[in-house]
Swiss-Prot record:
Record protein name field: Nucleoside diphosphate kinase A
Residues reported in the UniProt entry to bind ATP: K12, F60, R88, T94, R105, N115
Enzymatic reactions: a 2'-deoxyribonucleoside 5'-diphosphate + ATP = a 2'-deoxyribonucleoside 5'-triphosphate + ADP; a ribonucleoside 5'-diphosphate + ATP = a ribonucleoside 5'-triphosphate + ADP
Species classification: Eukaryota, Metazoa, Chordata, Craniata, Vertebrata
A GO biological process held by the record: GTP biosynthetic process
Homology family: Belongs to the NDK family.
Active site per the UniProt annotation: H118 (pros-phosphohistidine intermediate)
Keyword Transcription regulation: no
Gene from which this protein is expressed: NME1
Location in or out of the cell: Cytoplasm; Nucleus
Annotated InterPro entries: NDK-like_dom (IPR034907), NDK-like_dom_sf (IPR036850), Nucleoside_diP_kinase (IPR001564), Nucleoside_diP_kinase_AS (IPR023005)
Amino acid sequence: MANSERTFIAIKPDGVQRSLVGEIIKRFEQKGFRLIAMKLIQASEDLLKEHYIDLKDRPFFAGLVKYMQSGPVVAMVWEGLNVVKTGRVMLGETNPADSKPGTIRGDFCIQVGRNIIHGSDSVESAEKEIGLWFQPEELVDYKSCAQNWIYE
């Protein structure tokens, strides 16, 4: 498919503990995106510090890393047309109070510190994040039988 891209989506410990994994996957599948990698992982401090390196000087950095280590994370790679931009719209605003109903955060979150999900904010960030969380052989390339019903 032309112009296809990949994004990294992570369901944070609060989303896993609240049993929202299936609902979140369902939304991405129903939109028409293709899941090409997924794993349940207890993220290490080193992985999280590298993932959030852009936030290292922020006052909440240490708490964020500690929180992300507090439970399992579901790491995923999704593929599709404009999946980075569309995925971010589906997630809603970082602060759930600013998120519209119908978005993941608008429907399931109250506080910014428990916003249940992370999504890459650019194609470049997605490539970096996918490389941090997955080995190349963990990405499964296949043709979905629904692809012709989703894309022209």
